[in-house]
């Protein structure tokens, strides 16, 4: 078994992500990166599909019993995966230098999840927070899985050792700061949600040809 984490991801069937994920799959094949990337039915909305992320990760933790590296389906490997010091922690995530209550404080597009009980408990709390946010009848804002994770990391009791993931593992294409800071990325994130969110959320528009 490789000492590197197993790359895991999912994409939604019968959506544009079926084509988008092919770039991720091809990049994994090109660099011989071990991966398990699965197609799943859409839950009917972009936010519900995203909220499935921690549940999928828990499933993979149970099945694989090894460290995992989650990458969003619209990601692409630009160079080979390397063994990082952060892979000894329970959990690693990209953290921005902004206030802890900012919804974009962390970026969940790439995540390292170790095969530890502390990491498993953290992901469970994340899944629970996603569901609580989705079920909040008074909410007026869209639910982001990364905001649910932020809440868990900074406001919930957990025992996981959480460390920052290097920007090279989660460079956001088009982000001014990332473009300036990261010139040699391992993984780029293409933010396909900007193109496909409306497509997924409004099937009636597709039926009408809008």
Predicted regions and their residues:
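A structural signal for short, well-ordered beta-strand segments and their strand-loop junctions
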Residues: 36-38, 69-72, 93, 161-166
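Catalytic core and acceptor-binding pocket of nucleotide-sugar-dependent glycosyltransferases
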Residues: 119-210
């Amino acid at each position: 078994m490789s000492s590197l984490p197993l790359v895991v991801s999912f994409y939604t069937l019968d959506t544009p992500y079926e084509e988008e994920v092919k770039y991720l799959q091809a990049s994994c094949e090109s660099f011989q990166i071990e991966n398990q990337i699965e197609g799943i039915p859409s839950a009917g909305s972009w936010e519900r599909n995203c909220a499935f992320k921690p549940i999928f990760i828990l499933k993979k933790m149970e099945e694989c019993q090894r460290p995992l590296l989650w990458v969003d389906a619209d990601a692409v490997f630009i160079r080979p995966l390397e063994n990082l010091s952060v892979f000894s922690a329970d959990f690693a995530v990209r953290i921005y230098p902004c206030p802890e209550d900012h919804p974009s404080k962390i970026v969940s597009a790439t995540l390292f999840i170790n095969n530890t009980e502390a990491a498993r408990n953290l992901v469970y709390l994340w899944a629970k927070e996603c569901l609580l946010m989705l079920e909040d009848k008074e909410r007026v804002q869209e639910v982001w899985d990364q905001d649910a994770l932020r809440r868990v990391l900074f406001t919930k009791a957990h025992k996981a050792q959480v460390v920052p993931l290097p920007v090279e593992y989660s460079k956001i294409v088009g982000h001014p700061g990332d473009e300036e800071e990261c010139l040699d990325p391992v993984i780029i994130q293409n933010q396909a949600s900007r193109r496909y969110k409306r497509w997924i959320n409004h099937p009636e528009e597709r039926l009408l040809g809008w």
